[in-house]
């Protein structure tokens, strides 16, 4: 007899299992083994990495109305299961690890994703998400999830893949350091500056780059380079970026209104108003009149109207790879 109980279930559903082969993915679930029959509310939680924010996860759980919480990873363990299960009252909390394209092609993987009430894409390495998941039934199931108006969230690498335009980190080696702003400002077409598009179709995040660890890792320069590249490559005339610092999150409602929570530096919103003057291979970037808005914790921003309250608007320019701002003492963040 099937029991619906609060225990750890290690499930090995996989089409290849019937043939005696080990499953190509890992799926571990806490809570009921029966999927909830509940109606979720739309919402998007952008988390900037560092320490997990209880408020952001509680908000995501609230959008799920007690349904089934699914964490997606390309590598790693199921540590989020216990964290979310303790934090929220959910029907179930599960982690699905999809470590290669073979796993992403498994019919059971897409089925698990389609049955989830809320999905959170964990941090890690976004190149794995792009390499392993793009062009697979997993990607289709993820897009079906957001199209259906179900809540979704991501942190760090899992945050990066939520925008239409994505820094893919595709040419990074396992021991490479983080792509630094100085590298991109010196040459926006450097080998490691790999941009991809249309991985997910999250409402309100078209024409947008999303990034994390922003002030903590000094990522303003590389973000400006990404935006300039997007224009120079003909992808968009006026691309935008939403960037979250560590220990910060942006909670976006269905109408585009969002609030910033957390103890970090908050959120940054960038938009190009003029095309770059110099954005060529082997040459430092020159770019002027970038619109910027810094929204600290407690501030709000409307991603549809692209305006905020409780924060500070300023402008940024780049001259031969050097950043200049309209703020006092040329402050970038």
Located regions from the model:
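Structural motif
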Residues: 46, 118-122
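Short internal beta-strands
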Residues: 70-75
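Glycine/threonine-rich flexible loop motifs
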Residues: 126-136
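Portal/gating segments that form or line small-molecule/metal binding sites
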Residues: 76-115
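Catalytic-core regions built around general acid/base machinery
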Residues: 112-115, 135-149
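Catalytic nucleophile loop
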Residues: 122-123, 146-166
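Bacterial N-terminal signal peptides
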Residues: 5-15
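C-terminal and late-domain segments of enzyme folds
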Residues: 21-66, 87, 173-333
């Amino acid at each position: 007899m099937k029991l619906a109980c609060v225990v750890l279930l290690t499930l090995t559903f996989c089409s290849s299992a019937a043939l005696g082969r080990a499953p190509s993915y890992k799926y571990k679930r806490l809570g009921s083994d029966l999927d909830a029959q509940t109606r979720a509310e739309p919402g998007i939680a952008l988390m900037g990495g560092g320490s997990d924010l209880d408020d952001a996860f509680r908000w995501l759980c609230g959008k799920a109305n007690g349904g089934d919480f699914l964490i997606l990873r390309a590598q790693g363990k199921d540590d989020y299961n216990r964290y979310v299960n303790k934090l929220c009252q959910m029907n179930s909390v599960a982690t699905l690890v999809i470590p290669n394209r073979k796993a992403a092609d498994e019919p059971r993987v897409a089925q698990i994703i389609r049955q989830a009430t809320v999905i959170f894409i964990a941090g890690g390495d976004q190149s794995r998400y792009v390499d392993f998941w793009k062009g697979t039934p997993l990607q289709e199931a993820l897009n079906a999830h957001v199209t259906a108006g179900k809540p979704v969230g991501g942190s760090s690498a899992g945050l990066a893949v939520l925008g239409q335009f994505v820094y893919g980190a595709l040419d990074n080696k396992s021991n490479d350091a983080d792509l630094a702003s100085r590298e991109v400002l010196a040459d926006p077409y450097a080998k490691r500056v790999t941009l991809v598009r249309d991985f997910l179709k999250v409402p309100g995040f078209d024409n947008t780059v999303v990034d994390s660890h922003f002030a903590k890792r000094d990522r303003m320069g590389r973000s400006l380079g990404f935006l300039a590249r997007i224009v120079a490559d003909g992808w968009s005339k006026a691309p935008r970026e939403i960037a979250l610092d560590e220990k910060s999150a942006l909670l976006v409602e269905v109408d585009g209104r969002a609030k910033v929570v957390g103890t970090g530096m908050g959120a940054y919103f960038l938009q190009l108003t003029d095309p770059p003057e110099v954005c060529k291979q082997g040459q430092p970037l020159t770019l002027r009149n970038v619109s910027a808005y810094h929204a600290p914790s407690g501030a709000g921003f409307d991603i549809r109207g692209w305006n905020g309250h409780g924060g500070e608007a300023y402008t940024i320019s780049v001259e031969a790879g050097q950043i200049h701002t309209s703020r006092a003492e040329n402050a970038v963040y």
